[in-house]
UniProtKB/Swiss-Prot annotation:
Record-given protein name: tRNA uridine 5-carboxymethylaminomethyl modification enzyme MnmG
Coiled-coil zones: none
InterPro entries, alphabetized: FAD/NAD-bd_sf, GIDA_C_N, MnmG, MnmG-rel, MnmG-rel_CS, MnmG_C, MnmG_C_subdom, MnmG_C_subdom_sf
Main subcellular location of this protein, as a coarse class: cytoplasm
Described purpose of this protein according to its UniProt entry: NAD-binding protein involved in the addition of a carboxymethylaminomethyl (cmnm) group at the wobble position (U34) of certain tRNAs, forming tRNA-cmnm(5)s(2)U34.
Annotated family: Belongs to the MnmG family.
UniProt-listed Gene3D superfamilies: FAD/NAD(P)-binding domain, GidA associated domain, C-terminal subdomain, tRNA uridine 5-carboxymethylaminomethyl modification enzyme MnmG/GidA
Organism the protein comes from: Stutzerimonas stutzeri (strain A1501) (Pseudomonas stutzeri)
Length: 630
């Protein structure tokens, strides 16, 4: 039968992509249905209990700037917050939070259930209604037909999901959940390129069986970072520490002796796994020269003893998993609560998508998340928001939208997927963005919130907070520009004494702030009250200090564009080029591109790598000229 109500947008799947997609469409005012096989797993963190990290936090902040849920839920569920790369420049700093699974999921559920224009229905989707190459709706497991203008598929690892523990395997979307077999079969009938990918998860450990005195404590940062632009430290639950230990020679011996029982190394698994989150057996095999690998014990929550041992993802048989765990310092008596496993699943070549994440061959059908070959909650959430927004725009009869590479990491993510595709699970890094001095996590709202408001994604409260911040930045910049310090005055002498060099001439405070040895806090301590809002103060300081670098980067980008047709020698040995990662050396060696332009379009070859190639070619050319002149 047909469901009595028609919807504008239907979202299939209630993970990180699906929840952001459904919330985005509903915020834009269209009637939205979220179909999930289990209401209790909405927003579930299927793998590690953490949000953010290098490159990933930039996506979280962009989701937040566009009114999304991930950062808000993280502030409500985060039990440890840290800033990674804190000693480096703001462009590569990244906020990372350990999250309480229960609190995070509850925060997402609350947002979903209180979102106007959004309906939730528990039922697995088995089929799509497609007529004349246009999607018309969805058929559920019990034959119920839901009709809609746009459908967003966010199926995660559920399409044809196959779970592996040792040489045994069984169908599953994740541990404890059934796979989507009928829907996977239906999608394979469509004229879309399909492949198999793999991911994995480690065994979970009972913290009561762990000797933490044998490990290194890793507390969170003080003062506590905040994830959302609207967040506050008062929202955070009690904070906890993580713990660090290491694998050892005995661990590696156990793994090496049992590789023949690994589904990965015995040929049972066909799918390609994530390069930057390898299993422990893959680490031992690929990095045989390393004596040990770090293991981070991450708490799963405040009301459970379960720990997530980040660094030992495995699909080896359970008896081997137990040996591995108990060979590690501090875990000699550890009890495994849940075994680790690998999961294979279908994904579709993202080159068959438009920039809106709508499929090229079926109008109104959008894909987001792991179905597009990505890995990670943050990558999924960002795609979900974009797909949900474009599904709503289509239902409204409006043009689609996607940020450019110079506007957002989301733009980098989509451009990489759409133009290059991926043969392995795609993870975001800051190195993938050639405009990363502009695309900082601290200015995501300044880059995107105005567009979000225009699209209908940003509510009144967020818009008011954003406008106040933007006006505060302009006001403080103007104040600093109009405030002057002269040599020989009390202020001038105080600045000279603090920084060890007298003022040579009259400066305004904005000019002084641009100097590397002067920070905003020190400046206002010497010159009088400044901006009380820390976000405004941070933005004024970063904008002022980065101004020259940003201009220089724009020039570099223009030069890179001009170097499109620079030839690469056929005999170039990429392994000898300093600074290139092993991944990029391998890919360039396999593809043997003829020009820098071709090299730049190889999946995984970053703009930074192209710059290194250009520098190497210049050095090589200069060396050859010297030889000839000699």
């Amino acid at each position: 039968m047909d469901f009595p109500s028609r919807f504008d947008v239907i979202v299939i799947g209630g993970g990180h992509a699906g929840t952001e997609a459904a919330l985005a469409a509903a915020r834009m005012g269209v009637k939205t249905l979220l179909l999930t096989h289990n209401v209790e797993t909405l927003g579930q963190m299927s793998c590690n209990p953490a949000i953010g990290g290098i490159g990933k936090s930039h996506l979280v902040k962009e989701i937040d700037a566009l009114g999304g849920a991930m950062a808000v839920a993280t502030d409500k569920g985060g039990i440890q917050f840290r800033v990674l790369n804190s000693r480096k420049g703001p462009a590569v700093r990244a906020t990372r939070a350990q999250a309480d699974r229960v609190l995070y999921k509850a925060a997402i559920r609350e947002l979903l259930e209180n979102q106007p224009n959004l309906w939730i229905f528990q039922q697995a989707a088995d089929d799509l209604i497609v007529e004349q190459n246009e999607v018309r709706g969805v058929v559920t497991q019990m034959g119920l037909r839901f009709l809609a203008t746009s459908v967003v598929l966010t199926t995660g690892t559920f399409l044809g999901g196959l779970i592996h523990i040792g040489l045994q395997n069984y169908s599953g979307g994740r541990a404890g959940d059934p796979p989507s077999i009928a829907l996977a079969k239906r999608l394979r009938e469509l004229p879309l390129r399909v492949g198999r990918l793999k991911t994995g998860t480690p065994p979970r450990i009972d913290g009561r069986s762990v000797d933490f005195s044998q490990m290194t404590e890793q507390p969170g940062d003080t003062p506590l970072p905040v994830m959302s632009f609207l967040g506050s430290r008062e929202q955070h639950p009690p904070q906890v520490s993580c713990w660090i230990t290491h694998t050892n020679a005995r661990t590696h011996e156990i793994i090496a002796a049992n590789l023949d029982r690994s589904p990965m190394y015995s040929g049972v698994i066909e799918g390609v796994g994530p390069r930057y989150c390898p299993s422990i057996e893959d680490k031992i095999h690929r990095f045989a020269d390393k004596d040990s690998h770090q293991v981070f014990l991450e708490p799963e929550g405040l009301t459970t003893h379960e720990l997530y041992p980040n660094g030992i993802s495995t699909s080896l048989p359970f008896d081997v998993q137990l040996q591995i765990v108990q060979s590690i310092r501090g875990m000699e008596n550890a009890h495994i609560v849940r075994p680790g496993y690998a999961i294979e699943y279908d994904y579709f070549d993202p080159r068959d998508l438009k920039y809106s994440l709508e499929t090229k061959v079926i109008g109104g059908l959008f894909f987001a998340g792991q179905i597009n070959g990505t890995t990670g909650y943050e990558e999924a959430g960002a795609q979900g928001l974009l797909a949900g927004a474009n599904a709503a725009l289509r239902a409204q009869g409006k043009d689609s939208w996607c940020p450019r590479r110079d506007e957002a990491y989301l733009g980098v993510l989509v451009d990489d997927l759409i133009t290059l595709g991926t043969q392995e699970p795609y993870r975001m890094f800051t190195s993938r963005a050639e405009y990363r001095l502009i695309l900082r996590e601290d200015n995501a709202d300044l880059r995107l919130t105005e567009k979000g408001r225009e699209l209908g994604l940003v509510d009144d409260a967020r818009w008011a907070a954003f406008c106040a911040k933007r006006e505060g930045i302009e006001r403080e910049e103007q104040r600093l520009k109009n405030s002057w310090v002269r040599p020989g005055t009390p202020q001038g002498d105080a600045i000279a004494e603090r920084f060890g060099s007298p003022l040579a001439r009259e400066y305004n405070l904005l000019n002084l702030l641009a100097r590397p040895e002067i920070d905003y806090q020190s400046l206002i301590e010497l010159t009088g009250p400044g901006e009380p809002d820390p976000q405004v103060a941070e933005q004024v300081e970063i904008k002022t200090k980065y101004a020259g670098y940003i201009e220089r980067q724009q020039d570099e980008i223009e030069k890179l564009r001009a170097s499109e047709n620079v030839a690469l020698p056929a005999d170039l040995d990429y392994a000898t080029i300093s600074g290139l990662s092993k991944e990029i050396q391998h890919k360039l060696g396999q593809a043997r591109p003829q020009t820098l332009g071709q090299a730049s379009r190889i999946p995984g070859v970053t703009p930074a790598a192209v710059s290194l190639l250009m520098i190497h070619l210049k050095k090589r050319s200069a060396g050859q000229q010297l030889e000839q002149s000699a």
